[in-house]
């Protein structure tokens, strides 16, 4: 009798496991936030996408990112000319004028070597 009850329990447990199926429900959504900015008694609304939200039965994952600016950055002009900064003192002006003379003197010494 004990053996037959074990077979019946095994059959019931097997049929219960056979009807169970693993399933995962996934919901992927993008969150949009409305930002209201006010300046000088004027307000305007801007919609900003904050990221992607993935929801499963076990966990929720939030993916965020920094949005890229919509305006282009200014391009710096490339100039090949060199400028000398302004000199504010008389000693500075004398030193600025002396630099080419010293360089010329060193070049002259190099010619004799």
Curated annotation (Swiss-Prot):
Q: Principal localization?
A: secreted
**The keyword Nucleotide-binding belongs to this UniProt entry's keyword annotation:** no
Any one GO CC term of this protein is:
fungal-type cell wall
Lipid modification (GPI-anchor amidated glycine), residues: 92
Show the InterPro entries listed in the entry. Flocculin_t3_rpt
Phenotype upon gene inactivation = Leads to an altered cell wall structure with a less electron dense inner layer of the cell wall, and a disorganized outer layer.
How does this protein lie in the membrane?
Answer: Lipid-anchor; GPI-anchor
Coiled-coil annotated residue ranges, if any: none
| Signal peptide boundaries | 1-18
Keyword match Glycoprotein: yes
Q: Which GO biological process categories is it annotated with?
A: amyloid fibril formation; cellular response to neutral pH; filamentous growth; filamentous growth of a population of unicellular organisms in response to neutral pH; fungal-type cell wall biogenesis; fungal-type cell wall organization
Propiece residues:
93-113
The stated induction of this gene product is: Up-regulated during cell wall regeneration and down-regulated in kidney lesions. Expression is also regulated by HAP43 and SSN6.
Localization? Secreted, Cell wall; Membrane
Glycan-linked positions: 22, 80
PTM comment, free text = N- and O-glycosylated. The GPI-anchor is attached to the protein in the endoplasmic reticulum and serves to target the protein to the cell surface. There, the glucosamine-inositol phospholipid moiety is cleaved off and the GPI-modified mannoprotein is covalently attached via its lipidless GPI glycan remnant to the 1,6-beta-glucan of the outer cell wall layer.
Keyword set, alphabetical order: Cell wall, Glycoprotein, GPI-anchor, Lipoprotein, Membrane, Secreted, Signal
**Family per similarity comment:** Belongs to the HWP1 family.
Q: What does this protein do?
A: Cell wall protein necessary for cell wall integrity. Plays only a minor role in hyphal morphogenesis and is not critical to biofilm formation.
Q: What protein name applies here? A: Cell wall protein PGA59
The species is Candida albicans (strain SC5314 / ATCC MYA-2876) (Yeast)
């Amino acid at each position: 009798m004990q053996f037959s009850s074990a077979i019946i329990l095994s059959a019931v447990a097997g049929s219960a496991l056979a009807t169970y199926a693993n399933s995962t429900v996934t919901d992927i959504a993008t969150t949009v936030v409305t930002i209201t900015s006010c300046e000088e008694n004027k307000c305007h609304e801007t919609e900003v996408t904050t990221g992607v939200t993935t929801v499963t039965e076990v966990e929720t994952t939030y993916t965020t990112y920094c949005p890229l600016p919509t305006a282009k950055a200014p391009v710096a002009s490339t100039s090949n000319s060199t400028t000398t900064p302004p000199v504010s003192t008389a000693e500075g002006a004398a030193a600025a004028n002396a630099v080419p003379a010293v360089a010329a003197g060193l070049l002259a010494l190099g010619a004799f070597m």
